[in-house]
Amino acid sequence: MTAISDRDPKDRRNVMASIHHQIFIAANPDAIWNAARDVGRLHDRLVPGFVTATEMLPGDGAPVRRVTFVNGRVVDETIVSIDDAARRIVWAIKEFEHHNGALTVAAAAGGAQVTWIADLLPDALSEQVSPAMAHGLAMMKAHFEGSR
């Protein structure tokens, strides 16, 4: 499911996009969560084929990872929160005017329900970000279900 403002683009100048994607993965939710919370290993534990490299950057304060996607795009993400009890990780992409991403992993009959949410500005970026999120979840599913 994707939820993006349905207003005319010219009326969305000051509207923050809120993108929601969910996918069922027939795998142990703890295994998915353990890979997701390993924030420096996206490329080999969570979404190989979608992310090609993850590097933890040195510094004080919140952890920052540099993520290289298969299309060559590189972004720096600040890890805001890792909540093991809720199986929820939150991060922000530094180069956006505003970005708050969250991934949750919930137990479901026969596997896990994974939800990826992003709130972002400028709103126009949703046209690029939403399909990328859907593709990332599909790659995650393929990885954990062994159907790559």
What are these regions (language model features)?
Residues 21-23, 77-81, 100-107:
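Hydrophobic/aromatic beta-strand elements that line small-molecule binding cavities or substrate pockets
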Residues 40-44, 51-97, 113, 120, ...:
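Glycine-rich portal/gate segments that line the openings of hydrophobic small-molecule binding cavities
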Residues 90-143:
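Beta-strand/loop substructures that line and gate deep hydrophobic ligand-binding cavities in soluble
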Residues 20, 27, 60, 84-86, ...:
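Residue-level signal for tight coil/turn positions that link beta-strands
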Residues 2-57:
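Hydrophobic ligand-binding cavity/cleft-lining segments
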Residues 2-24, 108-113, 128-134, 146-148:
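Hydrophobic-ligand-binding modules of eukaryotic lipid transfer/binding families
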Residues 34-41, 84, 134-138, 142-146:
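Short, intrinsically disordered, mixed-charge
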